[in-house]
A protein has these predicted regions:
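C-terminal membrane-solvent junction of multi-pass transporters and transport-like membrane proteins
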Residues: 172, 323-394
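Transmembrane alpha-helical segments of multi-pass small-molecule transport proteins
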Residues: 14-18, 84-89, 110-132, 146-156, ...
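Hydrophobic transmembrane alpha-helices that form the core helical bundles
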Residues: 81-113, 261-277
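Juxtamembrane transmembrane-helix boundary signature
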Residues: 44-76, 83-89, 385-390
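Extracellular loop-to-transmembrane helix junctions
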Residues: 29-58, 80-82, 372, 376
Length: 394
């Protein structure tokens, strides 16, 4: 019997779950120094940039029916793609640990039973999500996401329309607009190496990809607003204290736990999918469970309070990688390079993009550093390919 494809609705639901997360709310709190107006502009611009990149990446996988790391083989070759598969698994293990740590820390701030207890509870729930499986998550996710959305709306109302707010924050110059844009791009960018793992199974590739990106972007913007609003109007940056200050007890706890589970499930699941790209002997589901266990143990053992450098490392690796894929697939329309071991030209172009990203980290631009890096990398990729084609014709 032919495997059932995922609907536009279920794809949208998956990415709704990705957007409703502690990571988005916590990142939103960083925007408070800009003041409300400039912070919102940076959030919107960053998500526009990140959303367009997500759509391009998701469409490649949706049209080719390939996972994210399988699409990487198309541009970098069978062996060349292993570098990105390994790096992707490592970043997903990192994200799994960070999300479980953040969720456990925040949950313990509401109900003091020990961070390690909450880490185990969250890890166990993620394993349940993995066992249920992507195509069978429809009803379970619908219930969980509807509840989370209602609770998020209540939290939004309390923060923005409640009484006893702190004095509004004005721009104090501690965060530049360009740096804020980069913080807004950071979350969509972190999903770039993952989105095709879900769009590849879509019944309607274009509609499912568009729905995934739009739903994620809108929900992520909303979550950023909650974090930013909490920091500006309540003067609080700690998620547990935000919940308590706004009058949430068990309700806040449910938001914390289930948003962490639904988001971290995507990280663990995609780590399993990427592991198959490294070795076909690996089973997706069991690899995802192993990643969840490792992430849970790491969340118990290691403190993970500052992830700025981790985000920049993700950007420097995957922004130029996706840029090369976009140039290859949409502009040059090159033949699939999967049969070759290495696609050396593209690997060199990626390295140029990687170095450029690290350099741009020290330059303040109005649009952050991801967009300039990707635009330049795309241009370099096209120029190199045109030169190579001209030389070959002679």
């Amino acid at each position: 019997m032919e495997k059932k494809g995922t609907s536009v609705f279920s794809n949208g639901l998956i990415w709704f779950g990705a957007g409703v997360s502690l990571a988005e709310i916590l990142t939103g709190t960083y925007f408070a120094p800009l003041g409300f107006g400039k912070a919102m502009a940076a959030i919107l611009l960053g998500h526009l940039i990140g959303g367009l990149m997500m759509f391009a990446a998701g469409m490649i996988g949706a049209k080719e029916r390939k996972s994210a790391m399988e699409t990487v083989k198309m541009s970098f070759g069978e062996r060349g793609s292993l570098l990105f598969a390994v790096l992707n698994v490592l970043q997903l293990v990192g994200w799994t640990a960070i999300m479980i740590y953040d969720g456990a820390l925040a949950a313990d701030g509401v109900l003091h039973t020990g961070i390690w207890v909450w880490a185990i509870i969250i890890g166990a729930l993620i394993v349940v999500w993995i066992f249920v499986g992507l195509t069978n998550l429809g009803k379970l996710n619908t219930v969980a996401m509807t509840a989370l959305f209602i609770l998020s709306l209540v939290l939004f109302k309390v923060i923005f329309f409640g009484t006893g707010s702190a004095a509004p924050v004005v721009d104090d110059g501690s965060l530049t607009f360009g740096a804020a844009v980069e913080l807004a791009v950071a979350m969509p960018l972190s999903w770039l190496p993952l989105i095709s793992d879900y769009t590849r199974e879509a019944e309607k590739p274009f509609a499912a990809t568009l729905a995934s990106v739009l739903v994620y972007s809108l929900v992520s913007i909303f979550m950023y607003m909650i974090g930013m609003g909490a920091a500006i109007f309540t003067g609080e940056y700690d998620i547990a204290q935000i919940m308590l200050k706004t009058g949430f007890g068990v309700v806040g706890l449910l938001i914390i736990v289930f948003s962490t589970v639904t988001t971290t499930f995507l990280d663990a699941y995609s780590a399993g999918v990427s592991s198959v790209s490294i070795s076909s002997k690996i089973k997706e589901k069991w690899a995802a469970i192993v990643v969840t266990v490792i992430g849970t143990v790491a969340a118990i053992v290691y403190p993970m309070d500052n992830i700025t450098n981790f985000l920049y490392l993700i950007g420097s690796v995957f922004a130029p990688m996706i840029a090369v894929q976009i140039a290859d697939y949409f502009i040059l329309k090159k033949a699939d390079a999967e049969e070759s071991a290495f696609q050396w030209r593209n690997l060199v172009v990626w390295l140029v993009g990687f170095v450029l990203y690290r350099v741009l980290m020290h330059v303040d631009t109005p649009v952050g550093n991801t967009l300039p890096d990707m635009v330049i990398t795309v241009i370099v990729c096209v120029i190199v390919e045109k030169i190579a084609a001209a030389v070959k014709e002679k």
